[in-house]
Amino acid sequence: MSLSSLEHKLTYHVRNWLHGSGFAWNTLHMSAFLVALCACIPAGFISQISLYSEPWREHLGYSVVEVNVLFSAVNLGGYITPPLLGLLSDAHGPVMLSWLSFVGFVPTYAYAAWVFASGEPHFYASVLCFTLIGISTNALYFSALFTASKLYPASKLCSISLPATFYGMASVLGSQLLKIPWFRNGLPYLDLSRVFRTLAVAYTLISFCMWFATSIVTMLKVKAATLTFAGMQSPTEPLLPQDIRRRLRNFFHDPAAYFMALVLLLSLGPMEMFLTNMGSLSSLLGQASVLPEFAIASTCSRFLSGLIIDLCIHNGVSTMSVQWAVLLLGVVGQWIVVLATRASDGPLLSLASALSGACYGGLFTVSPILTLAVWGDAVFGTAYGSFMITPAVGSILFGLTYAHIFDANCTPSGVLPVCIQHVFWSSTSALAIALLFSVLMYLVFWRRKV
């Protein structure tokens, strides 16, 4: 497949420099993969957004509803745009997404730092900024994910599981980094002006490194195109445009795709709500932040899910069993939150956070692997990107439900944690329905496919 004019221009100088650098191709190949994996970590730093809740409320005077609107703006930007990002990557290569992430991250975080330092709310401008940050988060992660999948298309561990695992590591590393006293600047909460300025600098450096990594993918594409022209087409080469259009048409007309979308809406929606509101929930129960438990379980689940799926494939076991297992963990985790609010039991919340984190991380590994297995790599970016629209809707619905119930029932001093239990009965029910639809999807459509 020939390069687009834009991809050619964006990578031209880097490719020329790399060609003249004398580095062995294997060295460039491995270096690009390692850079892509490392880029997945800062791509996941937005998972720390629940730690911004207290500074926003205390320093800028945002209400819980306004904080949840900012959370929803991130989710909206992150989940609505993946189909477009997938199409842009297919047309112009992952380098296009890495540049989009740079343009989206650096100015917005610089502005958000200024807003916090000024002490003025600037709420609507902040909503726009965090919508762009949500878009940029997915652009950087997709750029890294597609780079890894192009470099190692035959390995699910390298192409999907490891990028997802490194993305999940952001929660663990980020929460530890933000414990450094410098980020508090003597305040009882995070000084977000320092946090956001640091992120602006970090994303500048990461974008520069990804420019080189994605240019190596372009070199691989040029190499494959040269083999095609010579009549030695590789079986891993991209399909012809008409074949891609046919597969896209088949995907959008496949009823199973809509079952899959519903499963993700009813599972990732509640998980996003729990993740973004665990700060206020922990305060309600008098418990320290349970984000580390969620983050560690999520990271471990991302890696283990990939390994278990490889074992399932090797032993002829349906990979759907892994999705059922992680959904069941989510059901149990959210039900334990209900028990924790009834008993005002903080340690129970830690267990619920770990189980919910395992569900969350597992879904982000299992879902792309199932998408790749059923609809193929030719339309993987567009297909998986399309699925990411549905959790946006779910996260907004469940997040705003949490905010309204919290503001209505849980703001007076001395209120009991049971005031919020109805939200988690809803999330438990939603995950149980998602599990039911996942089983039906397998029995009706995928019995012989996965």
Curated annotation (Swiss-Prot):
Q: Which InterPro entries match?
A: MFS_trans_sf (IPR036259)
Q: Which residues cross the membrane?
A: 32-52, 69-89, 96-116, 127-147, 157-177, 199-219, 255-275, 290-309, 320-340, 355-375, 378-398, 423-443
Transmembrane helix recorded as keyword: yes
Q: Keywords assigned by UniProt?
A: Membrane, Transmembrane, Transmembrane helix, Transport, Vacuole
The membrane-topology field of this record reads: Multi-pass membrane protein
| Chief localisation class | membrane
Q: What is the documented function of this protein?
A: Probable transporter.
Instruction: Say which family it is in.
Output: Belongs to the major facilitator superfamily.
Q: What is this protein called?
A: Probable transporter MCH1
UniProt organism field: Eremothecium gossypii (strain ATCC 10895 / CBS 109.51 / FGSC 9923 / NRRL Y-1056)
